[in-house]
Amino acid sequence: MANIEKQAGELQEKLIAVNRVSKTVKGGRIMSFTALTVVGDGNGRVGFGYGKAREVPAAIQKAMEKARRNMINVALHEGTLQHPVKGIHTGSRVFMQPASEGTGIIAGGAMRAVLEVAGVRNVLSKAYGSTNPINVVRATIDALANMKSPEMVAAKRGKTVDEILG
């Protein structure tokens, strides 16, 4: 699970999973390792990376580099989400909704790590279907990327924020 946390400048890095995989060839098995990591600035930017190498440290390093390259911006509202969102990736489905101050991050495993590094402080969430960490992380990132702020909606509709919010 999310067991390594480092500060790289202003970025928080979390290691979610390390897995040993093998390729069978004529001469036997070739072992290698995969690593799944998330990186965020704690203020609405988050990304994930998946690295594979013959040694664990090299796999983690590759995953961190990919995570830094694949960051997205998330429109947060006072440390929580703008509105309830759903995300899907293959067999994993996630549902997240805003929570009041003091609730904390109610999420399991891989989803919790993504929300923590993104800077979300209060959220209620649930993962349905497959709980494979890679798919849950991708579904969570999908849900966060699809979340729209009232300013974004107002700009798209050509209205003011007050008209959108009623």
Swiss-Prot record:
What is a single cellular component term in the Gene Ontology annotation?
A: small ribosomal subunit
What is an example of a GO molecular function annotated in this UniProt entry? rRNA binding
Report the record's Gene Ontology biological process terms. Answer: translation
Q: Which UniProt keywords apply?
A: Ribonucleoprotein, Ribosomal protein, RNA-binding, rRNA-binding
Q: What is the superkingdom listed in this entry's lineage?
A: Bacteria
| Domain S5 DRBM: from-to ranges | 11-74
Give one Pfam hit by family name: Ribosomal_S5_C
Q: Which NCBIfam families match?
A: rpsE_bact
Q: Give the family per the record.
A: Belongs to the universal ribosomal protein uS5 family.
Its subunit composition reads: Part of the 30S ribosomal subunit. Contacts proteins S4 and S8.
Annotated domain remarks: The N-terminal domain interacts with the head of the 30S subunit; the C-terminal domain interacts with the body and contacts protein S4. The interaction surface between S4 and S5 is involved in control of translational fidelity.
Q: What does this protein do?
A: With S4 and S12 plays an important role in translational accuracy.
Stated name of the protein? Small ribosomal subunit protein uS5
